Amino acid sequence: MFGPAKGRHFGVHPAPGFPGGVSQQAAGTKAGPAGAWPVGSRTDTMWRLRCKAKDGTHVLQGLSSRTRVRELQGQIAAITGIAPGGQRILVGYPPECLDLSNGDTILEDLPIQSGDMLIIEEDQTRPRSSPAFTKRGASSYVRETLPVLTRTVVPADNSCLFTSVYYVVEGGVLNPACAPEMRRLIAQIVASDPDFYSEAILGKTNQEYCDWIKRDDTWGGAIEISILSKFYQCEICVVDTQTVRIDRFGEDAGYTKRVLLIYDGIHYDPLQRNFPDPDTPPLTIFSSNDDIVLVQALELADEARRRRQFTDVNRFTLRCMVCQKGLTGQAEAREHAKETGHTNFGEV
């Protein structure tokens, strides 16, 4: 069967005897997974915070609602030169000191919100930071521990989701020919549990869905990502360049690994971390505790959004490649497909 041997080789283990059974609300459509996401997937949102220190006001970059306290302190250290152990972070009026005792606390669990101004002071009751911990040293440390995340472009051939997932779980193997087997795998899983994968979930009968997903002109979405997350037993994070958010599939399942995709409204690409040493292969599988990679993914999405590198699926112009009718947005495309049975669309 597709996946198990190579998945194990790279540390992503398909679930033994996997029958399906992932909670979800709506199937992906020809226009991708915009809209409802599976129950249990979680969204990260980018946060914008400022900090005020002795040398002025600074903008803190690359934070999300799930950034940990220790990562926030690392960035503050890079800006101010105050070691994390000597920081006092105050917020509000009158200013109150945040509890920094647990470095694993995430920002959304603190009494702060995006847009707040943080006041940074040095705790005079603690030993002063050593001369080696300067702004320059801290900045170098942060740069070394935050390698750049990059996108690998895969073919836009209606199977970009499957090619992208294969790429990341196989440790950086680009193989568009994997798509038919992945489609058959998903069809087998769905067919094995018709009670769960009902028409209410799939938007069509179980048999119709299985026939549909095996075609090479249909697009994958939330349903397929959820199934692949459980099959490979890893969290699949999809960062959206239009909304600058991350939807996380399989987060609550206790998986120890995560992989990342970037989505622009109609196309998926895999994300990977490259290293300066050309002999070191790119990293595509991350620890599920590595929240730094999530922040980097949000930064990448935010940059793409500012450059308008996304497609608004509710407004983009399509043409039915069967009858050549012009359509606007995924809603019209979905209705046209329902009325005519035509499902091959191209973007104009």
From Swiss-Prot:
Changing C160S: Abolishes deubiquitinase activity without affecting interaction with VCP. Specifically blocks a step in the course of dislocation and/or degradation of endoplasmic reticulum-resident proteins destined for proteasomal degradation. This is Ubiquitin thioesterase OTU1. Residues 154-160 are annotated as: Cys-loop. One of its GO terms (cellular component) is cytoplasm. It comes from the Eukaryota. Residues 213-223 are annotated as: Variable-loop. Its EC number is 3.4.19.12.
